[in-house]
């Protein structure tokens, strides 16, 4: 189920406060956040977010194509280890 239109997109209140402070000051520093569920809004375009993936903060630069997606989509939580075929000839 999608979110109700009358509610609007979810963005953490403390994250919006940080964005508003950054825009008021005119700085372009990285904004550290643990809120992976926050939706990317048009006001976030051009900002860099350090999104926590459970181990470290991954830098995410927001572009106009990311609007409507969640911040957590751009900081993967799992590292993929490729399925390596064992070379049986090298064992002998």
Curated annotation (Swiss-Prot):
Major localization listed first in the record, in broad terms: plastid
Highest rank taxon of the organism: Eukaryota
InterPro entries named in the record: Ribosomal_uS19, Ribosomal_uS19_bac-type, Ribosomal_uS19_CS, Ribosomal_uS19_SF
Claim: Endoplasmic reticulum is one of the keywords in the record: no
GO biological process: ribosomal small subunit assembly; translation
Keyword field contains tRNA processing: no
SUPFAM superfamilies reported in the protein's UniProt record: Ribosomal protein S19
GO MF, one annotated term: structural constituent of ribosome
One Gene Ontology CC term in the entry: mitochondrial small ribosomal subunit
Pfam families listed in its UniProt record: Ribosomal_S19 (PF00203)
Signal peptide: none
HAMAP family reported for this sequence: Ribosomal_uS19 (MF_00531)
UniProt xrefs under PANTHER family: RIBOSOMAL PROTEIN S19P FAMILY MEMBER, SMALL RIBOSOMAL SUBUNIT PROTEIN US19M
Job of this protein: Protein S19 forms a complex with S13 that binds strongly to the 16S ribosomal RNA.
Protein name stated in the entry: Small ribosomal subunit protein uS19c
């Amino acid at each position: 189920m999608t979110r109700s239109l009358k509610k609007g997109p979810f963005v953490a209140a403390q994250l919006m406060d940080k964005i508003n402070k950054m825009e008021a000051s005119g700085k372009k520093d990285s904004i550290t956040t643990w809120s992976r569920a926050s939706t990317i809004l048009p006001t976030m375009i051009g900002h860099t977010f350090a999104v926590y993936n459970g181990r470290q903060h991954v830098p995410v630069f927001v572009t106009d194509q990311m609007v409507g997606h969640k911040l957590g989509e751009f900081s993967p939580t799992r590292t993929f280890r490729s399925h390596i075929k064992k070379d049986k000839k090298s064992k002998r």
